[in-house]
């Protein structure tokens, strides 16, 4: 009976662990998506925070053109 109780407890522990791990998966996926979006947003913000010496302000649209772009009446142009 002692061995039977041990295997019963072991089986219950395995089933409980698998249930807990499956329930945690959707939360982990949302964390991964959120981290991915924050990296994308962070890289967008980083592109706009270049040093002032490497930017020229476009008077037509009041934005900064980063080299090798140049300012035209319609906005920043260049590669």
Swiss-Prot record:
4-hydroxyproline, modified sites: 59, 67-68, 73
Domain of life: Eukaryota
Intracellular or extracellular location(s): Secreted
GO-annotated molecular function: toxin activity
Annotated Gene Ontology cellular component terms: extracellular region
Chief location bin: secreted
Disulfide feature: 58-66, 61-71, 65-76
Annotated tissue distribution: Expressed by the venom duct.
Keywords annotated in UniProt: Disulfide bond, Hydroxylation, Secreted, Signal, Toxin
Domain notes: The cysteine framework is VI/VII (C-C-CC-C-C).
Similarity section: Belongs to the conotoxin U superfamily.
Protein name: Conotoxin ba-2281
Provenance organism: Conus bayani
